[in-house]
Amino acid sequence: MNKCVELVVGKNIRCLREKSGMTQDMLAAKLQLSGCDITRSAIAKIEVAQRHLYPDEIILIKEILDVSYDEIFDIQ
């Protein structure tokens, strides 16, 4: 992904995570339970575009936060 897109996607994930009442620790734990090898620190880096998102992580984040891909990739 392009850096500008990663910034927007990261902000969207943070906003959606906070809207669902979930902390970075909680999201990381749910991702880990779903088989994703990720830490709270990695979530923090994703939210500020310091780490790339992998397709399997995007799919799981979408499912855990119960949002659509459009909400995650909403670039306006």
PLM feature segments, named:
Residues 50-71:
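DNA major-groove recognition helix of helix-turn-helix/homeodomain DNA-binding modules
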Residues 13, 24, 40, 55-58:
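Helix-turn-helix DNA-binding elements, focusing on the entry/boundary residues of the two helices
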Residues 32-52:
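Recognition helix of helix-turn-helix/homeodomain-like DNA-binding domains
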Residues 11-32:
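Short basic helix-loop element that most often maps to the first helix and adjoining turn
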Residues 13, 27-28, 43-46, 72:
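Conserved hydrophobic/aromatic packing and binding residues within compact polymer-binding modules
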Residues 1-8, 74-75:
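A detector for short, charged/polar N-terminal pre-domain segments
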